[in-house]
Regions:
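Sec-dependent signal peptide recognition
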Residues: 2-8
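Hydrophobic core
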Residues: 9-17, 219
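N-terminal accessory/pre-domain segments preceding catalytic cores
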Residues: 13, 19-169
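Alpha-helix capping and helix-loop boundary segments enriched in small/acidic/polar residues
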Residues: 62, 78, 202-206, 230
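Conserved active-site-adjacent core of cysteine acyl-enzyme catalytic domains
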Residues: 145, 193-202, 206, 210-217
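Secondary-structure boundary elements
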Residues: 146-200
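Catalytic cysteine-centered active-site loop
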Residues: 192-198, 205, 226-236
Length: 274
């Protein structure tokens, strides 16, 4: 969702959290067979042998930190599976609802997994004494070979952006520089199916999710803590923006609304500190 007319680099001190209701990954589920559960038990070892397609960021894992401690292990296993584009089912000791919470958190924390949008299929089982378990098979928007082939373009976009920050000395200057670079090099379009950062970086176009994930990725690469916020904008339309740390405080930044168009369709850049 993009607001027409003036909009914002919203640098508003964060006083409330970001809700994730209505944003849980979708998938199918059925009762587990013994063979399926056995296959899921061996998936972790299989995935550990594979290289990551992109370096996994650990600068800011805000959504993971909101999970109960017992679910963070489930998150970590699904995290590694997504990082290596693992296609085998993974068994976790969690209910279906808990798995979906972990996948939502994973989607928020890791913009670098541009091949994964939180989708998965599920096989559930409930064993007396042992409790609930779920076999999870992640699904991807592209195959591993395609994702790997796009990494040089991601690296080139990052370099081009960071080259413009040569004079930036403070985190604020870096935040503003990345914000302005994305706006100057991206066209907002509604017909983009891909909601990751890859369309912004390779085709220079995207929706609010693409803007926000690109900003988040670049902040994390600079070592600046940043997370993704998902909610609604004007008109109750779904919207994505960022929350970034600067000078010890957390602020909201909306790159999409900082890249407005007026009623004539003319582009522009907007800065609004509130």
């Amino acid at each position: 969702m993009k607001r027409i007319v003036s909009a914002a680099l919203l640098m508003t001190c964060l006083l409330t959290g970001c809700g994730m209701s209505g944003l849980l990954p979708q998938g199918s589920t059925h009762a587990a067979s013994q063979n399926e559960l056995y296959a899921a038990q061996t998936a972790k070892e299989t995935h550990e042998l594979r290289p990551q397609l992109m370096e996994t960021q650990t600068v800011c894992l805000w959504a993971r930190e909101q999970l109960p401690e017992e679910l963070q292990a489930t998150y970590d296993l699904l995290d590694h599976t997504a990082a290596v584009h693992g296609e085998e089912p993974v068994q976790v000791e969690a209910t279906l609802e808990e798995v979906r919470r972990c996948l939502s958190a994973l989607r928020i924390d890791h913009p670098e997994y541009f091949w994964f949008d939180g989708a998965a299929s599920y096989t559930t089982a409930s064993v007396p004494i042992l409790g609930d378990s779920t076999s999870v098979t992640l699904t991807y928007t592209m195959d591993a070979e395609t994702a790997r082939s796009l990494k040089p373009q991601v690296d080139a976009y990052e370099k081009a952006c960071f080259d413009t920050l040569a004079a930036a000395q403070t985190d604020y200057q870096k935040i503003l520089g990345v914000y302005q670079y994305i706006i100057a090099n991206t066209d907002y379009v509604l017909d983009v199916q891909d909601q990751s950062m890859i369309c912004v970086m390779t085709e220079h176009r995207g929706t609010c999710a693409g803007y926000a994930k690109t900003f988040q990725y670049l902040m994390l690469r600079l070592g600046i803590p940043c997370t993704l916020a998902l909610g609604t904008g004007e008109g109750s339309e779904s919207h994505g923006w960022n929350i970034v740390e600067c000078g010890g405080d957390w602020y909201q930044v909306d790159v999409t609304w900082g890249d407005p168009v007026d009623e004539t369709g003319a582009p522009g850049t907007s800065l609004d500190y509130t």
